[in-house]
Amino acid sequence: MKSLLDSLNFPKDLNNLNDSDTERLSKEIRQFLIESVSKTGGHLSSNLGVVELTLSLMKSFDFEKDKIVWDVGHQSYVYKILTGRKDGFKNLRQFDGLSGFPKRNESKYDYFDTGHSSTSISAGLGMARARDLKKEKYTVVSVIGDGALTGGMALEALNDVGFRKTKMVIILNDNQMSISLNVGGLSRYLNKLRMGETYNRLKTNINTSLGSSDLGKDIISKMSKVKDSIKQLVVPSMFFENMGVKYIGPIDGHDIKAMNEVFSKVKDVEGPVIIHTVTQKGRGYSLAEKSPSKYHAVPPRANEKEKPSKPCKDTYSKAFGNALINIAKEEKEVVAITAAMPDGTGLKEFSTIYPERFFDVGIAEQHAVTLAAGMAANGLKPVFAVYSTFLQRGFDQVIHDVCIQDLPVTFAIDRAGIVGDDGETHQGIMDVSYLSMMPNMTIVAPKCTEEIPSMLRWAIKKNSPVAIRYPRGKDIVCNLHALQEISYGKWEVVSEGKRICIIASGRMLQHAFLAKEILKENGIDPKIVNATFIKPIDKCLLENLKEDGYDILTIEDNIICGGLGMAVLEHLNCIDYKGNMKLLGYDDEFIPQGNVEILYKTYGLDPVSISNTILKLYN
């Protein structure tokens, strides 16, 4: 039988499908996702869960003119498949390939770029208000998950949309089964009744008639209380109604017919409406259904032709988690905080061993930072483990609530530097630059996983804010000698040499080691310094380099502006340094998706490129 999926390229192609065809298409899409994403890597279980929801949205709305915003965006694969991008999945999340998130520059059907959570309602509301001011006619749809709805930004947007009654449709994709579908028939009946034209006209007429007298107003008030009491029993989210947003649901997010009926009617509802759909993460793939978190993001299938390298022992996340557990055994005031990332940040085991000292605040980085500040102000030693890209969401709180008060909060910044496949929204290349400008903040970086325990212990004992930044994954050079004693503001000379000194921080120190081996074959033997401290820099060592006549090359997995290299350059200018200096890092641009090794090579930060930079300097 000919594949339906192969005959579909654009949203309008769905209009001719009957119920049987749509059901068949759902199965074909799931099979395609499982086969394709298993090869390239990507977000799997979340996309398997929204197949029917996406199909229903695309059959019910016209996304040639209607606009859709996908919160976070990693559940947009089905939408991409059905908007002419199916063939691009062979290069999903690869360098110059199809993005794993909505991208306006990728398709006319992508109306807003996303990557971080809780932004869709604000963005959709902005589009809706632009539509109204320009006197245009189209529907704006924001799709947000139950997890993203915990973000403060989403709640701020709900408050705004409900207050001004702006017309838009919000789809709450609840894939946690947190609200049972057993409300069943009565809920469906009330939803159908409340969407009906007769009900809304009658409601308006009654309010108009009775509202003209004091007795009538009293009757309306009593009727409203009775109605609210019933709704509290059968509709699980009076919360939305109280914010001024009409609530419909919950409805089965895998029942296309039921969703079509609801979606076709809400377009005519004036004001904001939220439709609560319940979906199953990993639907149609038994392994993902049993372990949706495990299959949330899957790695690419290994190339059988490539010889597997022997990786170093632990990931940085694992090393951090183990170190914190050991420290917590001795330091009873130590507590751990995460913003919905216990697995990714290495805190899962800590949460099991010390549940009363572990705090997962949900997708709420701003709250997490100030929570840590409050704990520190009252004698605890909080450690906030967070991805670099997400810490920037709590920028003001780090300044206002932590640094101004000089509170002892430790920031364990995971995924610092290039992270690869998720692209611009997830690269961790700015934390050094924005943290360096904050008074009282100290920034350190381990050169290897074995250095994390001593560095973390030092940070926790320091009575002021400390940020420890480390990359995703494992070391690429194993068995480096790890510092056991950390001295404030002091760098480490890890390899002596002549003529030029390479100053590198974090993983870039390992790249410097590999570059040195290449350079030695060409008659150049650089000195290598580990910038253990990114802030403050080791001014005394820099002055010694000047006196000894070294040229200097700095390497960092961060943007150059505001980074380590700029701090070094500033001090060298102050001491009238006359040697050659070169700064390696990322220029003033966002770094796209791609394999980490490819990106390092593209931006001149791999060992070969580093050695070539030095060779050009002398040739």
Curated annotation (Swiss-Prot):
Concerning its family, UniProt says: Belongs to the transketolase family. DXPS subfamily.
Which PROSITE patterns does its entry note? Answer: TRANSKETOLASE_1 (PS00801)
Q: How does it assemble?
A: Homodimer.
| Single GO MF descriptor | thiamine pyrophosphate binding
Cofactor note from UniProt?
Binds 1 Mg(2+) ion per subunit. Binds 1 thiamine pyrophosphate per subunit.
Query: What residue spans carry the Basic and acidic residues bias annotation?
Result: 302-312
Tell me the GO BP annotations in alphabetical order: 1-deoxy-D-xylulose 5-phosphate biosynthetic process; isopentenyl diphosphate biosynthetic process, methylerythritol 4-phosphate pathway; terpenoid biosynthetic process; thiamine biosynthetic process
UniProt entry tagged with the keyword Lipid biosynthesis: no
Q: Where does thiamine diphosphate bind?
A: H74, G115, H116, S117, G147, A148, N175, Y285, E365
What catalytic activity is recorded?
D-glyceraldehyde 3-phosphate + pyruvate + H(+) = 1-deoxy-D-xylulose 5-phosphate + CO2
State the name under which the record lists this protein: 1-deoxy-D-xylulose-5-phosphate synthase
* Membrane-crossing segments per the record: none
Q: Where is this region: Disordered?
A: 289-312
What EC number(s) does this enzyme carry? 2.2.1.7
Q: Which Gene3D superfamilies match?
A: 3.40.50.920, 3.40.50.970
